[in-house]
Amino acid sequence: MTLLETTDIHQNLLSYDYYKLAANPSFGLERAATLIQQARAQYPNNLLLDDGDLIQGTALGDYQAVVNPVKCASTLAVHKVMNYLKYDAGTIGNHEFNYGLP
């Protein structure tokens, strides 16, 4: 069994810094997705987990929480990507509470 783990994604879905308006290949879930796919091909018996701090930290997080809040029945962009990558489980981080509770 191989454990694959991510943490502190903070809505960094793309390798792009929206505050500096510039590409930044040092972060982004898209970058991790490539590594996840490679690891899954090499180790087929695996679990993909996340340690939390998903929804706060970028302009996208602020937009989906404050400007145009996502309803409880809808899915945040980061969760759509995680569903696409087929995460097996995740935990709640402290930043999941930055915007309060619905």
Segments and roles (model prediction):
Residues M1-P102:
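N-terminal catalytic scaffold of extracellular/periplasmic and nuclease hydrolases
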